[in-house]
Amino acid sequence: MPEPSKSAPAPKKGSKKAVTKAQKKDGKKRKRSRKESYSVYVYKVLKQVHPDTGISSKAMGIMNSFVNDIFERIAGEASRLAHYNKRSTITSREIQTAVRLLLPGELAKHAVSEGTKAVTKYTSSK
């Protein structure tokens, strides 16, 4: 049985072929695509609740996934509610109802009160 063929040998030191993939033809480096996340906001909330506590990058990744998941669930439920009521706009009322439907008991009450507080603060600052 023949050996599996290996990829091209690595270029030698000083070789002109050793141009990285991140470089364009004119020598400029390609700009890295920005990865959006909630890490800044998770960190701010953590410092409000536990000022002396840190968070690992793995835990931050988990928190980011959690926030994305909850966002998608609430947005999906709010969209469904708007569709049921033949509305084309998702308002704070749909979001509030979606939160009440998705989150259990006391957690929903706290989320609704915090949301109402945030909306009030936003509208008063305008």
Curated annotation (Swiss-Prot):
Glycyl lysine isopeptide (Lys-Gly) (interchain with G-Cter in ubiquitin) crosslink residues: K35, K121
Keyword Glycoprotein recorded: yes
Modification(s) after translation: Monoubiquitination at Lys-35 (H2BK34Ub) by the MSL1/MSL2 dimer is required for histone H3 'Lys-4' (H3K4me) and 'Lys-79' (H3K79me) methylation and transcription activation at specific gene loci, such as HOXA9 and MEIS1 loci. Similarly, monoubiquitination at Lys-121 (H2BK120Ub) by the RNF20/40 complex gives a specific tag for epigenetic transcriptional activation and is also prerequisite for histone H3 'Lys-4' and 'Lys-79' methylation. It also functions cooperatively with the FACT dimer to stimulate elongation by RNA polymerase II. Phosphorylation at Ser-37 (H2BS36ph) by AMPK in response to stress promotes transcription. Phosphorylated on Ser-15 (H2BS14ph) by STK4/MST1 during apoptosis; which facilitates apoptotic chromatin condensation. Also phosphorylated on Ser-15 in response to DNA double strand breaks (DSBs), and in correlation with somatic hypermutation and immunoglobulin class-switch recombination.
N6-lactoyllysine PTM sites in chain numbering: K6, K12, K16, K17, K21, K24, K44, K86, K109, K117, K121
Listed Low complexity bias regions: 1-12
Any one biological process term the GO annotation gives: nucleosome assembly
UniProt keyword list: Acetylation, ADP-ribosylation, Chromosome, DNA-binding, Glycoprotein, Hydroxylation, Isopeptide bond, Methylation, Nucleosome core, Nucleus, Phosphoprotein, Ubl conjugation
N6,N6,N6-trimethyllysine, modified sites: K86
Modified residues (N6-methylated lysine): K117
Role, per record: Core component of nucleosome. Nucleosomes wrap and compact DNA into chromatin, limiting DNA accessibility to the cellular machineries which require DNA as a template. Histones thereby play a central role in transcription regulation, DNA repair, DNA replication and chromosomal stability. DNA accessibility is regulated via a complex set of post-translational modifications of histones, also called histone code, and nucleosome remodeling.
PANTHER family to which the protein is assigned, alphabetical: HISTONE H2B
Family from the record: Belongs to the histone H2B family.
Protein name from the UniProt record: Histone H2B type 1-N
